[in-house]
Amino acid sequence: MGRCTIADVAMLIRWRVSLMVAGATFFGAMLAVPHVTITHLLASLATFLLAGGCSAINQVQEADLDAVIPRTASRPIPCGRIGHMYGSLMGLALVTVGWMVLCLAGGLTSLLVGIGIVAVYNGLYTPLKRRTSFALLVGAAAGAMPPVVGWLAVGGHPASPMLVVVYTLYLLWQIPHFWLHAARDREAYRKARLPLPLLSLPHERYARLLKVWFHAYAVAVLMVPAFPLLEGVGMRIMVTLCGIALLFAAMLAVRKRRVALHIADAVLCAVMVVLLIDRLAIPVSLF
């Protein structure tokens, strides 16, 4: 193992992604209880630790794949700056501490959810990536859980329509987001022999399937103003426009990949902000 730096550790835990996971957890907690408590902060810290631990373990599991994909080849394990044992121990330590903090924040239910996330992501999704082109469906199920963790940790009802809609939004967003990102490294994924849909399916079928996911994502967004989840008329109009933007992005998904990706990501952020503003009862005027 070569010399390990703080930058290497940050790359190992993918701190930006982990921070976004923590933000999604905080968002879910604020939707359930719209004022900040210590539980909000502990749940967010717990998911940051869990995301970092899952990332470290994942990079140990996929070190051989990371080495042949340009986007990931500079990660510390493929480059030899961090050894497999060190990466595994760090990942397990972060996950363990994350579980402890999550149990402190939300009790046994939150702990079980946290254990389930790690089991699905590292135990199912990561190995399945080498076997089936639709492993992302499994990974997305775990990836959509951070808002749920936050919601449950602060005592939100598990069968709330708001929670179901938010989980669905995160779930459906991940598929086109990942597929559009993967298109950038198409040849590297082919070299790594990963059975992604854009490689294993004929182009026409892949394009149709990508559009179907965009349409499903758009429908989920349009469900928000259709159901009594928003109080303000202005908020409903904003979310409706977001859904229309996704329908437009579906038409660009194949020809203008980067534009479609930016729209998909921006819509998720916009809907999160709208839901939070509406929940906090912040007055907003469109005119």
From Swiss-Prot:
A GO MF label: protoheme IX farnesyltransferase activity
Record's GO cellular component terms: plasma membrane
GO BP term, example: heme O biosynthetic process
Pfam families named among the record's database cross-references: UbiA (PF01040)
Recorded superkingdom: Bacteria
Keyword Transferase tagged: yes
Membrane topology: Multi-pass membrane protein
Subcellular location: Cell inner membrane
Catalysed conversion reaction: heme b + (2E,6E)-farnesyl diphosphate + H2O = Fe(II)-heme o + diphosphate
Alphabetical UniProt keywords: Cell inner membrane, Cell membrane, Heme biosynthesis, Membrane, Transferase, Transmembrane, Transmembrane helix
Pathway it works in: Porphyrin-containing compound metabolism; heme O biosynthesis; heme O from protoheme: step 1/1
rRNA-binding listed as a keyword: no
Transmembrane segments: 19-39, 100-120, 134-154, 162-182, 212-232, 233-253, 267-287
Enzyme class, first EC level, given as a word: transferase
Additional observations: Carbon 2 of the heme B porphyrin ring is defined according to the Fischer nomenclature.
PANTHER family: 4-HYDROXYBENZOATE SOLANESYLTRANSFERASE, PROTOHEME IX FARNESYLTRANSFERASE, MITOCHONDRIAL
Family: Belongs to the UbiA prenyltransferase family. Protoheme IX farnesyltransferase subfamily.
Role played: Converts heme B (protoheme IX) to heme O by substitution of the vinyl group on carbon 2 of heme B porphyrin ring with a hydroxyethyl farnesyl side group.
Protein name listed in UniProt: Protoheme IX farnesyltransferase
Organism: Nitratidesulfovibrio vulgaris (strain DP4)
